[in-house]
Structures are given as structure tokens and as C-alpha cells.
């Protein structure tokens, strides 16, 4: 089981980020309360953490700079660790990076995506996506949903997502006579 983890909007909330940025104290951009909630998911499911955040550029199988080290330090306090990260592919969406990870790890069947933003998830990924409220970050409701998804109870996916509809309409407008 795998957790694809975004950082901003998941392991922090807007107030927490604002306070850290105001003080220019980037070491506090990860909220310990949110890490405790993440630990709950890991303990219940035995999942491994895959960093899918833009913070991944600071973490290359080892933290490569202070931001990567902060990620590791924040997680280590709770007995957690990043095991891998999604590939950083130039001009690719987060959705494409997660797809690339899954193609390179075909044995991964059970996974959840914790992210506050819609990155154009395709239908398969959308059913594994638990969207956090970026203003709130990870909360008890998202934790329960994530555990449920990891246990095989996938998220309902509308027949056509907003993203899919936008792409379809855009193509129709461009290619229609």
C-alpha cells in the first residue's frame, strides 16, 4: 500500500503556512498535528509514503537540501519516512508523474493520493484521490477516506469529470467545422 503525498495543503494549512512565511521560518511549514494524522493512516494500513509534491525536487532518494531535510525531520519525529518519490518530469502534470511511478512499479495496486488540488487526474487516479481542503490540510475525515481507499473502497468517480469535460469541449471547439 502506498500514499502519494503532497505537502502544502495536506501537511499544513493556510494559516500555518502564512505564519511560517511571515517569520521567514521555513522549518515550520510542516504542521506536527497533520503529521500525526498521516501517521494514523500509516499505522492502520502499513502504507509506504511516496512524495508526490513539488517539494520532491528537494528530495532525491535522500534529502538534497534543507527543505528535503525538513521533510525527513518532520516525519521522523513520528516514526515515518519517505520511501520514494514520483519522478520529476519536465512539463508533466502531477497526474502524469504518478502514472509514471505506477508504470515503473506494476506491483502497486493499493494506493491513495493525498492532495488538495486537482491535477487533471484521469478516471483511474481520481478514484484513489482524497482531496484535502488546502485551507485546512489533512483532517480526520480525509484520514478516514484515505484508509477506506487503501482498503479497496475507491472514491466514486462521476461519469465525466470536470477536467474531462473541459478537454472534450476544447477539442470540439478546435476541431469542429
Tell what function each PLM region has.
Residues 19, 61, 142:
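Short acidic, gly/pro-rich beta-turn/loop elements at beta-sheet edges
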Residues 5, 52-55, 114-116:
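Short His-Asn-centered micro-motif
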Residues 68-177:
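C-terminal cap/substrate-recognition subdomain and adjoining C-terminal extension
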Amino acid at each position: 500500500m502506498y500514499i502519494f503525498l503532497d505537502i502544502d495543503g495536506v501537511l499544513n494549512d493556510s494559516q500555518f503556512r502564512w505564519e511560517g512565511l511571515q517569520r521567514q521560518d521555513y522549518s515550520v511549514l510542516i504542521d506536527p498535528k497533520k503529521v500525526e494524522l498521516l501517521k494514523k493512516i500509516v499505522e492502520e494500513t502499513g502504507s509506504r509514503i511516496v512524495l508526490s509534491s513539488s517539494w520532491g525536487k528537494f528530495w532525491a532518494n535522500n534529502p538534497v537540501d534543507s527543505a528535503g531535510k525538513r521533510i525527513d525531520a518532520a516525519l521522523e519525529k513520528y516514526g515515518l519516512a519517505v520511501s520514494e518519490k514520483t519522478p520529476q518530469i519536465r512539463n508533466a502534470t502531477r497526474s502524469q508523474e504518478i502514472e509514471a511511478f505506477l508504470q515503473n512499479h506494476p506491483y502497486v495496486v493499493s494506493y491513495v493520493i493525498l492532495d488538495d488540488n486537482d491535477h487533471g487526474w484521469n478516471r483511474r487516479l481520481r478514484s484513489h484521490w482524497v482531496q484535502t481542503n488546502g485551507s485546512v490540510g489533512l483532517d480526520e475525515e480525509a484520514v478516514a477516506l484515505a484508509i477506506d481507499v487503501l482498503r479497496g473502497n475507491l472514491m466514486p468517480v462521476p461519469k465525466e469529470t470536470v477536467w474531462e469535460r473541459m478537454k472534450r469541449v476544447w477539442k470540439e471547439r478546435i476541431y469542429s467545422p
